[in-house]
């Protein structure tokens, strides 16, 4: 490679020993020149993007809503299904849900309410909404809470009273209906609904007689999670049902509901994939409820409403998208994030299994602790309007659409985060909205009502 030498008189005059030193100027190679061009182009593109995109702080200030404002209106109305999920066990989470529900119901934007429960329990939540029977409601909350113990709470009990009040203020054609698509939580209300659907004379099937007596006495353990008395009663009934389907189909009050109950009982007798079951139940029950034409509000845990895979495993909402049930933009996902809050943690019992108290947690378990927190949560905290602030994350020109792991990446003290699991993803792949829930007290167990 030849180099061009340039003699510089001014420089050489300052050097000692009267020796002349040439200054060497190396010409860039073709490869180096190309690299410089690429770098310049990249910097230009980045500068253009920055010029047209807002900072996160500016964006959040322009896209935030106060849920506690009496004039609050949810900013999106065009959807097929909308979901709200947050960490379980904190009081203001239930309040946020009630505000969202009331706003959407009043605007006639949702027809069905899908809580994190099974078909049987949901059916009797509908009975409560009609009757106002608080004894029934308390028992429903106890069984509903078997799925999520942190929501077996006074706050959940009061939330349902609030839902009833909202529903009572609606015209008949605008009242919501509760539908359960989750795996069976306990056998009690599944069994009760089966008996209501299948009126069989005493003595025809011993398995049915035993099922009827079990529900009537109501003193057994209704757990589907081990070989309980109720599980064995239902096993025997399923055998008779399968052997005489024609008869049972001829007497049922609702074949679709009966078929779904039977299928879900059978699933409890073997290992099952919960998320797949939720998705399958949704599709099956859509025959009855026509979900595509009647929007639903879903209240489930954080993961179930994510719109993209996490650890390559598809959530309920992700399955709806991947199976072309709905387009991604037809699904709205709202994630709740806690700060300066506490959650219900454990229930305490004495040696006789009598309830004696509970514990709460305000560090681990809320997603905003110095040892464990969501990346980017400080941006929400610094721009909040009230204790319940809603942020629209996927509006036009949102920085959350561009290679961000905010609100999905979990930072851990002295441990590796889940950043690699989110490679190639961005915040709005998962959620459309975020609610910052501040200064929330922990839920109180439903058992506290009996004190």
Briefly describe each language-model feature range.
Residues 52-451:
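Compositional signal for N-terminal targeting/processing segments
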Residues 1-4, 13-18, 23-24, 29-59:
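Bacterial Sec-dependent N-terminal signal peptides
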